[in-house]
Each structure stands twice: as C-alpha cells, then as structure tokens.
UniProtKB/Swiss-Prot annotation:
It comes from the Viruses. One of its GO terms (biological process) is DNA integration. Belongs to the site-specific recombinase resolvase family. One of its GO terms (molecular function) is DNA binding. It holds the Pfam family Resolvase. Keywords: DNA integration, DNA invertase, DNA recombination, DNA-binding. InterPro entries: Recombinase_CS (IPR006118), Resolv_N (IPR006119), Resolvase-like_N_sf (IPR036162), SSR_resolvase (IPR050639). Residues 11-82 form the Resolvase/invertase-type recombinase catalytic domain. It comes from Bacillus phage phi105 (Bacteriophage phi-105). The active site is at 19 (o-(5'-phospho-dna)-serine intermediate). This is Uncharacterized immunity region protein 3.
Length: 82
C-alpha cells in the first residue's frame, strides 16, 4: 500500500504471522520472515520500519492484535507504507 510519493520518507509497517508449528518448520518461521523482509527493506533504501508480529494466529481469526495495531498506525499516519 503506497500512500505517498517516491520522495516522501517512508515509515514501513511489516506484518508477519505464523499460525502453525508445521509452517515454522517449513521455513516460514517468524525469524525467517523478518530476515527476508528486513533484507527487502534495506534493498529498497527503507531504513524506517517496524515489525508487527502475531504468533500462532490463524488467518481466519480477524482479531489479531498486531494486525489491528498496524492498521491503526496506518490510519493515524504513523506508518506510510505496509
């Protein structure tokens, strides 16, 4: 979601989630996701980013605390990209 033009400093919100242990074993662990997404931010020149993490939360559960916090931060303009 790009809310501003290319010249505007970016505050990037990064949401990561794993719902099962099986996913974590297959390389989708929280730490693996963070590592890949941090590398992507660095490759894009984005140095201001925040991770929002929900562990053990199903995608079916719409009440995910970190996702809700990230969405509030977007609404408040704290995060300009996600």
């Amino acid at each position: 979601m790009n809310l501003m033009d290319e010249n505007t400093p970016k505050n990037v919100g990064i949401y990561v989630r794993v719902s099962t242990e099986e996913q974590a074993k297959e390389g989708y662990s929280i730490s693996a996701q963070k590592e890949k997404l941090k590398a992507y931010c660095i490759s894009q020149g984005w140095d201001s980013y925040k991770f929002y993490i929900d562990e053990g939360k199903s995608a079916k559960d719409i009440h995910r605390p970190s996702l809700e916090l990230m969405l509030r931060h977007i609404e408040q303009g704290i995060m300009t990209h996600c």
